[in-house]
Amino acid sequence: MPTKRFDKKHWKMVVVLLAICGAMLLLRWAAMIWG
């Protein structure tokens, strides 16, 4: 069974991945607008 510490670390990793995906989408959007 996963511990609370593991859950916190997993949640933090998911947030970081979502932030990276969002940044990449914003960069692609800006490139389409400026290009």
Curated annotation (Swiss-Prot):
Q: Indicate the principal place this protein occupies in or around the cell.
A: membrane
Compartments where located = Membrane
Task: List, alphabetically, the InterPro entries matched.
Answer: YniD-like (IPR048084)
Stated membrane topology is: Single-pass membrane protein
Q: Which UniProt keywords apply?
A: Membrane, Stress response, Transmembrane, Transmembrane helix
Task: Offer a single GO CC term for the protein.
Answer: membrane
Q: What upregulates or represses it?
A: Constitutively expressed (at protein level).
Membrane-crossing residue ranges in chain numbering: 14-34
Recorded hits in NCBIfam families, A to Z, give: membrane_YniD
The protein's name in its UniProt record? Uncharacterized protein YniD
Lineage here is: Bacteria, Pseudomonadati, Pseudomonadota, Gammaproteobacteria, Enterobacterales
